[in-house]
Design a protein with these regions (language model features):
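Class I S-adenosyl-L-methionine-dependent methyltransferase catalytic core
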Residues: 1-189
C-alpha cells in the first residue's frame, strides 16, 4: 500500500493557490491557512530582501510561502528523509530558486550554523520555529536561534502552549487558533 500524501495550499504571492504535497509523519501538522495568513499579514506581503530559515520545515508551508512572497532566500531544515524528499520534489515542481533543503537534525543544524554566523551575511531576518506539536524542541531551539539572527530579525513561534517572554525574547504579536498558539517574537535589545 502506498504512503498517504497530504497537501497544503500556498495562500499568497507568486505561487498563490498552488499545492505542495507531503507524506504522513509523526508530529507533522502544517500551520493552518488562517494562521499563515495572519503571520504573513504581520510580516508583510512582500518579503523581498529577507533571508529566511524554516528550522523544522515539515510540509514546507512556511518556507514556500516566504519564497512565494519574494524572500531572497530560504533555508529549510527537516530531519525525516521522506519529508526532505517531498520538500525537494515540491521545490522542483515550483521551480523554486534560492532554496536550500537540509536533511538534518534542526538543533544540530542550528548549533553548527551559529558557529559560522559570526558574519552577518550568514544570519537570518526571519526564522520559522514550528517544531513537531507537543514536543519540547522549541525550548531547546530558542537559545540556538538567538545566535542566528540579524539585527531586527523576527521569529515566528508555533506551539501547544502560549509563548512567554523572557531570556531576551519579546512578544510582538500573539494569537491562538484552536489548540495552537502562535507568536511573532524578537530577540535582544
Amino acid at each position: 500500500m502506498a504512503a498517504k500524501s497530504n497537501q497544503v495550499r500556498i495562500i499568497g504571492g507568486e505561487w498563490r493557490s498552488r499545492r505542495v504535497t507531503f507524506p504522513d509523519h509523526e508530529g507533522l501538522r502544517p500551520s493552518a491557512d488562517r494562521v499563515r495568513e495572519t503571520l504573513f499579514n504581520w510580516l508583510g506581503q512582500d518579503l523581498s530582501g529577507l533571508r529566511c530559515l524554516d528550522l523544522f520545515a515539515g510540509s514546507g508551508a512556511l518556507g514556500f510561502e516566504a519564497l512565494s512572497r519574494g524572500a531572497d532566500s530560504v533555508v529549510m531544515v527537516e530531519k525525516s528523509p521522506r519529508v526532505c524528499e517531498a520538500l525537494r520534489r515540491n521545490a522542483g515542481l515550483l521551480a523554486a530558486k534560492n532554496l536550500s533543503v537540509h536533511c538534518a537534525d534542526a538543533l544540530e543544524f542550528a548549533t553548527a550554523s551559529a558557529a559560522s554566523a559570526a558574519d552577518a551575511t550568514a544570519r537570518f531576518d526571519v526564522v520559522f520555529l514550528d517544531p513537531p506539536f507537543r514536543s519540547d524542541l522549541l525550548l531547546q531551539a530558542l537559545p540556538k536561534v538567538g545566535k542566528l539572527l540579524r539585527p531586527g530579525a523576527q521569529v515566528y513561534v508555533e506551539s501547544a502552549a502560549a509563548f512567554v517572554s523572557g531570556n531576551g525574547w519579546r512578544i510582538k504579536r500573539q494569537g491562538r487558533a484552536g489548540q495552537v498558539y502562535y507568536s511573532l517574537v524578537t530577540y535582544g535589545d
